[in-house]
């Protein structure tokens, strides 16, 4: 403590230096607008507008995926039970899926719902965690060892790996929560397998509830929430962390784990 207190005399950087040398304080400019870190055609978050005098003004929030408003997606979609699946297809491939496209894509997700054999017992139940974000990091990193070629960064193969990770997210999150509540909350441990006939939202609700029950309204609400959180562009800390880490040509599991670490911060 003594050394730490004294060290403060040698570590402070005057705020005026940031302006003098044009250094950004985090991912914000001085006027509180976002720092431009790259270009994307995937997602666009509109949280403010610039008036005629160049001042930043708060605006009604808008979110676009591939140029399509999420409000329009929710209101016009024919796939009432698979909004998240439809949105993730759009984000990954750049266009809205046909009914046949969505069916094939959803089937691919369903193929990856379940965790590898022994994963639940060895990586989740044996080592329950106090924080779900840390557990999710560990879970993602552990999946690396179940991949036959985890360090292959070919674009197409990375896409396939990413879809498989997406498919397993409900199981990773829900089982980590169940283990935490059992070990730290002293609650009964009841586990449900993901069901192939369920969507991502439906499986999350089913796996979290002791009796596995949920209403259509609950499933639809969670489906919309998943859609809204599917992508927020490149200006968030978690996405930025992924951009930095993946630029080293590391494996996908390490990149995603770094994003989760950044996302955990308040």
Language-model segments: which ranges?
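Hydrophobic alpha-helical bundle cores within soluble ligand-binding/oligomerization subdomains
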Residues: 1-266
